[in-house]
Amino acid sequence: MPELRHITSSALDELSREAFKSAEVERAAIVVLQGARSWGAHERGAITLPDDGGTLVFPVSYDAREAPYTVDEQGLERTLISLSDEEGYLACVWARPCQGSSLVGVGIDLASPRDFDTSERGRRLTELMFTDAEHDLVNATFSSNLPYGYAVAFGAKEAAFKATAAPLRTWYRSHTEELSYDLRHFSLVDPHRARGEARDGTAQAALDKMGIARIAVQYVEVAGMALVVATAFNT
């Protein structure tokens, strides 16, 4: 089994504090692991994470959108969880909200600047994923490193989209109306404050129906990639 490395840094600690500073949670953590997927930290059925010198094991299932979720012995989804893997790294954010907490969803994404380089594939991806306004934002804010800027902007979309997974599952437990939206309907609107929000009417209408009042995103650089965490709140 390949050696597993737990990535720690003051930047990741600060990211966790910022992501959950306005959320009432019993516990929450952002974990980044380096190693091949095959070493077993993440398998279809469970994820094992380092925790204060020991380990935590979450039983993991996947919904119709392939979003991971975990339930306790009573079959209740008390812990919110999201996963992302990229270039040999696995990132996880999990949180156990207090009763009555406004936190309803979490999302995480590792986005590589290599996907947004000057190659033909990179150019096609940026054209597909971003509006003119988003191109202007990235060019104005990340002019010295455009591929990283696009990775941040893409990671914000993906993480925000993932943060709606738990509210969407809750919606379908009592509704038959299909809510249709994708990650392109979200946008990083303020890279200095790292705010994310729904961009168009389709996504906003879905968020309103699910009771999501706001989605915040935070990001740091990890191994040259953008690590973005999103938190969804109902107030």
Language model feature labels by segment:
Residues 1-235:
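Core catalytic alpha/beta fold that binds nucleotide/phospho-ligands
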